[in-house]
Amino acid sequence: MDKFVIRTPRIQNSPQKKDSGGKVYKQATIESLKRVVVVEDIKRWKTMLELPDQTKENLVEALQELKKKIPSREVLKSTRIGHTVNKMRKHSDSEVASLAREVYTEWKTFTEKHSNRPSIEVRSDPKTESLRKNAQKLLSEALELKMDHLLVENIERETFHLCSRLINGPYRRTVRALVFTLKHRAEIRAQVKSGSLPVGTFVQTHKK
């Protein structure tokens, strides 16, 4: 009696058979790593936390982003972000205060245990910082505020963030649009200064 070999098609995605031993790998960028700290982002979140009349939504967002990072002792000292987070532990909103306590405790614990372990810091070059200072100057004049005012810093940092942390065409056009509106639209300027128009919303609607 003849024998035949019958080949059946292999089913690729059979729901009946699962590979329990297989590992799933997820691609990660270097900036997504907990010990890789972009100093600009730390400063941006710091201004969000310190800006008067900041919305709860923005405070929670900033703290949640900070929770994903563990700055080195040097970054904590140079930016004073630890001091800012520490103050937020006494915030009147319980959710904000609780989140701030979590961030502060995690940072403090890690720093004490790994005091000699360096982190990777990403900083802007001098030319970029010079161009950004000029943008802050234009914004301060349009807002009729001093250049070192928190609101001026917050608007510029939000703009820089939305433009992928690059001094490019979109950044320059967005700054010009913001300055024009602040100079010629008194009602918008008043809303931004009072906090009734959140900085994030203001910048987003003028992004070019």
Swiss-Prot record:
GO process terms (BP): DNA-templated transcription; regulation of transcription by RNA polymerase II
GO CC list: nucleus
Organism domain of life: Eukaryota
Keywords from the UniProt entry: Acetylation, Nucleus
Keyword Transferase assigned: no
Alphabetical list of InterPro entries matching this protein: TFIIS/CRSP70_N_sub (IPR003617), TFIIS/LEDGF_dom_sf (IPR035441), TFIIS_cen_dom (IPR003618), TFIIS_cen_dom_sf (IPR036575), TFIIS_N (IPR017923)
TFIIS central domain residues: 131-208
Pfam families per the UniProt record, alphabetical: Med26 (PF08711)
Keyword Acetylation part of the UniProt annotation: yes
Residues modified as N-acetylmethionine: M1
Residues of the TFIIS N-terminal domain: 40-114
Subcellular location: Nucleus
CDD domains reported in the protein's UniProt record: TFIIS_I (cd00183)
Positions of region (Disordered): 1-21
Listed PROSITE patterns: TFIIS_CENTRAL, TFIIS_N
Similarity field: Belongs to the TCEANC2 family.
Protein name as annotated: Transcription elongation factor A N-terminal and central domain-containing protein 2
The species this protein was found in: Homo sapiens (Human)
